């Protein structure tokens, strides 16, 4: 017999369904559920008196080879491909299905490969939001404590370079040379996150670059502090093309070896990832932003300029002087710093993100950026732009399109750009189960739980001496997946194809699983999902005013931001 339930009661029990809307944190961003994979009346739910019991939603005949290891029930999923509600099935550390889990012997509509059995444990996703683990592709490995900070904010993959607090690492994301690379690969072996190292790409001779690829780097960083000349760019891209790795570029702020046009000429038709294209983080002054126009250049922004506020400009001067080893008592050093900081390009950056012209947001960790703010800054920018411009033309009664555009900036697009999208970057069957769970009220600020390779590695947790898990203080803590040898199965070290094929990990004693980057050279900005626009950019060299497709861009700085004081004491 059919039983009708009030919508508000249904939401309390099973979470929202099709047509229901959710506010993200305290922003003005509203999502709407596009599809619900469940069969009404056949929802799976764990607990006393609920239906995930033997012979009901749990198939008593399903052995380990056919049952899920873990199921997340009735969770809202936000991903580039949709905003939906359903169950997430995990097996052998990978997502095997997004749909309807349960017992097909007694339930209708159970998705193949999503059988709940005696081998299955349950994470209740009712009322929660699931997203793919974030990917930060601009990490200065200055201190190991960054990794835990990033993890607790929902970042499960770090790509960048460095060897600790050296002058080079504090300024550039380079792990230079085989000896340093091997030491860093060993150093990160026990961290419960995915990591890929970038080598130093600044060489006008190919052999030192080839040595670094063979030592395992997933790409190169070309940085002006090491000399970002046209010859260096050309040489590095030749090696990258030969070995199928990516190149990240921080261009020549002082225009010593050429202007932005010379850099574009040196790049040719080859693909690369252009860091902090607004320019405050470094790059041809005042017009590095022009690289956004080209389909073979994948542009990104870093957290310190996102979004543009009344405080952004003023905090940059001291930050820049320290990070690039300048002397505030030397006039020429101060002038160099000032030349890189322009409010007009900072304002235009927000606009270009909102129209999908800048593809990625990453941190620039401890080198003018904050690793724990990648996700928060992304959604603050989206919220700021909605407050100013209203809904996007593609949105009607919700903000689904804008939300898909912005979540792609730190999930699927960096994965595509760096050759790891076949493994991670979205919640899709066949990919590693790197999943972050959020309460809607805390979305983008403080996760509830972080699943890495199908196993819980971090979660909010109360007093360990309490009778239940919830008594205060409730803080994010590492869970069992972050300890012991479990890390070797749940986390991955990304390496070059050469390193992987020659099993160099075994020769140097790496225990963690290694996977090769692929398809770094046959992509373009056109592959950046929801973020592949190629607007015409012009910059007035006297006033630094920015024109996009002929229109002057004048986005006001934010006076206050959401997702801030309501959530944090400091």
Curated annotation (Swiss-Prot):
Cofactor dependence: Ni cation
Binding site for substrate: 223
Residues binding Ni(2+) 1: 138, 140, 221, 364
Keywords: Cytoplasm, Hydrolase, Metal-binding, Nickel
PROSITE patterns: UREASE_1 (PS01120), UREASE_3 (PS51368)
Pfam families assigned: Amidohydro_1, Urease_alpha
Descriptive protein name: Urease subunit alpha
GO process annotations (BP): urea catabolic process
GO MF term list: nickel cation binding; urease activity
Pathway: Nitrogen metabolism; urea degradation; CO(2) and NH(3) from urea (urease route): step 1/1
Annotated positions binding Ni(2+) 2: 221, 250, 276
Active-site residues, record numbering mapped to chain: 324 (proton donor)
Catalytic activity reported: urea + 2 H2O + H(+) = hydrogencarbonate + 2 NH4(+)
EC main group: hydrolase
Family: Belongs to the metallo-dependent hydrolases superfamily. Urease alpha subunit family.
Taxonomy, superkingdom: Bacteria
Gene Ontology CC: one annotated term: cytoplasm
Primary localization class, coarse: cytoplasm
Cofactor note: Binds 2 nickel ions per subunit.
Species: Caldicellulosiruptor saccharolyticus (strain ATCC 43494 / DSM 8903 / Tp8T 6331)
PTM (free text): Carboxylation allows a single lysine to coordinate two nickel ions.
Subcellular location as annotated: Cytoplasm
Catalytic activity, EC: 3.5.1.5
Quaternary structure and interacting proteins, as annotated: Heterotrimer of UreA (gamma), UreB (beta) and UreC (alpha) subunits. Three heterotrimers associate to form the active enzyme.
Sites bearing N6-carboxylysine, chain numbering: 221
């Amino acid at each position: 017999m059919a039983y009708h339930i009030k919508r508000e009661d249904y939401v309390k029990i099973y979470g929202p369904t099709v047509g229901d809307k959710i506010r993200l944190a305290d922003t003005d961003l509203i999502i709407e559920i596009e599809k619900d994979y469940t069969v009404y009346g056949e929802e799976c739910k764990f607990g006393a008196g609920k239906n995930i019991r033997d012979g009901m939603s749990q198939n008593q005949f399903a052995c380990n080879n056919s049952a899920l290891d873990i199921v997340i029930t009735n969770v809202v999923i936000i991903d580039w491909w949709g905003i939906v509600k359903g169950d997430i099935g995990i097996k052998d550390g990978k997502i095997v299905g997004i749909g309807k889990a349960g017992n097909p012997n007694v339930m209708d509509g159970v998705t193949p490969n999503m059988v709940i059995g005696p081998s299955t444990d349950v994470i209740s996703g009712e009322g929660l939001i699931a997203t793919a683990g974030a990917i930060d592709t601009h990490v200065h490995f200055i201190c190991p404590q960054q990794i835990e900070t990033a993890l607790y904010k929902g970042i499960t993959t770090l790509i960048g370079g460095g060897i600790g607090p050296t002058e080079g690492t504090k300024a550039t994301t380079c792990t230079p040379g085989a000896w340093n690379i091997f030491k860093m690969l060993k150093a990160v072996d026990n961290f419960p996150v995915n990591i890929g190292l970038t080598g130093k790409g600044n060489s006008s001779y190919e052999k030192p670059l080839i040595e670094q690829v063979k030592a395992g780097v997933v790409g190169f960083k070309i940085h002006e502090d090491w000399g970002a000349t046209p010859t260096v760019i050309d040489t590095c891209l030749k090696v990258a093309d030969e070995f199928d790795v990516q190149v990240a570029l921080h261009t020549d702020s002082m225009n010593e070896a050429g202007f932005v046009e010379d850099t574009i000429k040196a790049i040719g038709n080859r693909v690369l990832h252009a860091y902090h294209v607004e320019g405050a983080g470094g790059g041809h002054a005042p017009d590095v932003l022009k690289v956004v126009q080209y389909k073979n250049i994948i542009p990104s922004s870093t957290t310190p300029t996102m979004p543009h506020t009344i405080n952004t400009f003023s905090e940059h001067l001291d930050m820049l002087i320290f990070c690039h080893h300048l002397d505030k008592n030397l006039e020429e050093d101060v002038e160099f710093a000032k030349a890189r900081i322009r409010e007009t390009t900072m304002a235009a950056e927000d606009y270009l993100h909102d129209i999908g012209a800048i593809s990625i947001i990453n941190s620039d960790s401890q080198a003018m950026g904050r690793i724990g703010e990648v996700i928060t800054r992304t959604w603050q920018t989206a919220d700021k732009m909605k407050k100013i411009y209203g809904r996007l033309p593609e949105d009607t009664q919700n903000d689904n399109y804008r939300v898909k555009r912005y979540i792609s900036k730190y999930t699927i697009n960096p994965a595509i750009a760096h050759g790891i999208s076949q493994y991670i970057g979205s919640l899709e069957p066949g990919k590693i189960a790197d999943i972050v769970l959020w309460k809607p009220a805390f979305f983008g600020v403080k996760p509830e739980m972080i699943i890495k390779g199908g196993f819980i590695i971090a979660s909010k947790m109360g007093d360990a001496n309490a009778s239940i898990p919830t008594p205060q203080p409730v803080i994010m803590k590492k869970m069992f997946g972050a300890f012991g040898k479990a890390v070797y199965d749940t986390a991955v070290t990304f390496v070059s194809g050469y390193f992987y094929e020659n099993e160099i990990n075994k020769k140097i004693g790496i225990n963690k699983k290694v996977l090769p980057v692929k398809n770094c050279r046959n992509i373009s900005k056109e592959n950046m999902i929801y973020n592949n626009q190629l607007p015409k950019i012009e910059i007035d060299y006297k006033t630094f005013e920015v024109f996009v497709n002929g229109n002057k861009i004048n986005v006001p700085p934010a006076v206050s931001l959401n997702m801030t004081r309501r959530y944090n004491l400091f």
